[in-house]
Curated annotation (Swiss-Prot):
Cofactors (names): a divalent metal cation
Name by which UniProt lists this protein: NAD kinase
EC numbers on record: 2.7.1.23
Listed Pfam families: NAD_kinase (PF01513), NAD_kinase_C (PF20143)
Organism: Chloroherpeton thalassium (strain ATCC 35110 / GB-78)
UniProt enzyme class: transferase
Family under the similarity heading: Belongs to the NAD kinase family.
Catalytic activity: NAD(+) + ATP = ADP + NADP(+) + H(+)
Gene: nadK
Signal peptide (UniProt feature, chain positions): none
Known function: Involved in the regulation of the intracellular balance of NAD and NADP, and is a key enzyme in the biosynthesis of NADP. Catalyzes specifically the phosphorylation on 2'-hydroxyl of the adenosine moiety of NAD to yield NADP.
Amino acid sequence: MKFGIVVNTNRPRAIAAGKELISWMRKEQIDFVLDANSAENLKESPSVEMENMHEQADFFVSLGGDGTLLGVSHFSNTKPIIGINLGRLGFLAEFCEHEMYDVIKRVLQNNFMLENRTQLEVSVSGKGQVRNFTGLNDVVIEKGTYPGVPVISVSIDNNLVSEYRADGVIIATSTGSTGYSLSAGGPIIIPKSKVFVVTPVCPHMLTVRPMVICDDKEIEVRVETPGDRFVLNCDGMLIQNISPSHQIRVRKAKNTVNLIANERRNYYNVLRQKFHWGKEQES
């Protein structure tokens, strides 16, 4: 059994944890490989390019925050991910640093629970090209550097829902509902719910609200305003610039992202702790 280790090299704490983990794995004779960037920054080996890591690793270990785990999910190719939270919120990265060794031991003993998270599959066609990619949290179509308020049309199963006059539109999974969508006024959705949420960003339309839909629907998005400064990003990573000539289709992906679950965690406790629900504000 081999573990693929990915470290957020922008966090000194993650680098330190990565070095400790590698030292422990060598001592325990546990097979591992690092992605090339982590290996270079930690001055460790062996390494492999990130896009090829799934060919060597049976499990991924993500050392960082939720953003690090999101990046890993794009390359895991259904291989299970152990998320070690060394960031801030830690919705996706379920394990604390002090739980790192215990969860790896349990994986080695085949004593673990998997949580399958739905992904978005996104198809962008235009200018004679078609690009396909996936996202665990969300896909966002936004104004980019366009100075005005663009019009973005959204259709569901070929039925027009609205032409939003807004800074952008977020399409989020239940997993991604506590990310950008929440900041834009969207609802919190329990991760295993079989739904997507369509959330407009700063709509110049007083009656517009986020919409929750079944995840068996196909969503089509188009920018109706002329220009080429609009952007499409996925899980916080820029994918490409878009224009009215592009057609964007979003649906449920065939493959899930598979996370090693922390059986000691309760999602409602996590919400209460992370968002400080029920706590009085100190003066």
